[in-house]
Amino acid sequence: GYSISAGQRKLTRFLLNYHFNAQDIWWLRTKGMSEEFCEYLRTYQWKGDMYALPEGTVAYPHVQMVRIECDLVGAILIETYLLQTMNFHSLIATKATRVTGLNTHTPRSVMEFGTRRAQGESAGNDGAYAAVLGGCVGTANCLAEMKFGAEVKAVGTVAHSFIEFFPTEFDAFKAFADTYPDSVSLLLDTYNIMESGLPNLIKLDDYLIEKYPNDPNRRVKSARIDSGDLARGSKRLRKALDAAGKPYIKLVASNGLDEKKIANMELYEHAHFDSYGVGENLITSASDPVFGGVYKLVAVKQPDGGYTPKMKCSDSASKAIIPGKKMPWRLYDENGQAQCDLIAMDDEVIEAGKPVTMVNLDSDAIERTVTITPTKVKKLLVPHVLNGQLAIELPSIAEKKAYIAKQLTQETWESELRLECPHKHYVNMTPAVAECRSKMYAELHGGKV
């Protein structure tokens, strides 16, 4: 399996502006915080370093998404925000790549429709951003476009309530078209799709042709159905619209969709939809609603500049944290596909064209130690914040979308991308990391990993 690492943009901006205001200090005093500590926080600014995967990087278990280097107080203060931000953004961006078909190399047009089912305002806005990163063409959340810009485009159709308000369905359609003649997108299932919605759609488009005969842009752009047998409805509508000389009107489906329902309609029912609106199953990632990223202390810097590794143990050796200040690398074969990820100590250098000996993280692996010669290697963590200052030019959303698509189509094994029983990506350790982990686990917990 795979995930998409996201949230770096928001986390970076948070760290650059991290401080306590007067109201924060007042409230902390009411909770018994010492005057000395409150005074310390009054002038506190986060001055640490943040190394992270570039936003949109394909990520795997055990491989760090973010590495924080700062004072202990700063590391503790940002923990909850870091986890909330990275976990939620990564969850939705990953789900979006599945819904939009990027993982199966069959991209489809999907709009994010889930704001009303999101767990709160921030989830609605951040989820829209992450969904667009993962391949969605836009969102029904207008506030998201206002916050993030035109790359998170606000899209959608009219509501059932709008149509119900008017004396007739055609009156509603006409009112909308007269107000927004350049972006007429209608909803057909308020009353009866074939007996009412379709005839009124054709009537409205004929009205626009008569009103704007020399402006082909002022036509009905699309029509959505939100109930009933979607696949059957799409075929009936497509046939009727083509027969009426209106093949340019696109069909949109919504109503409890996810990647599996869409795939079933396309593969087995031959549905004729041009686009999909996906709501709660995307904005909540209903099939896998939790992204379990953790944030652990792995090393403490000493006065001489060296680092003492630290480790949180577990009765399950596989859950034991990998200690030490580390740097993950990605190793590629001659075809440009990622062979594996390699967790190395920060001062270790991995070189392309030279044999690399690795220890498999899976203790049950038949071959615990393997050696490969990668054609290309890439150090995965890049500095985003250094000494509290921005250290990277944050790419545009379009650049990040293209980056995600390139990885999924050119660099990731198809077997890792499938929905059912995906192949497990190889994540290995250098011998130095493996030895440090095994030695510390034996000392602290009395066993071996």
Regions of interest found by a model, annotated:
Residues 32, 38-47, 56-247, 257-264, ...:
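Buried, small/hydrophobic-residue-enriched core segments of structured protein domains
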Residues 13-16, 52-55, 59:
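An N-terminal, globular interaction/scaffold subdomain
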Residues 25-27, 94-98, 114, 416-422:
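Short coil/turn segments at secondary-structure boundaries
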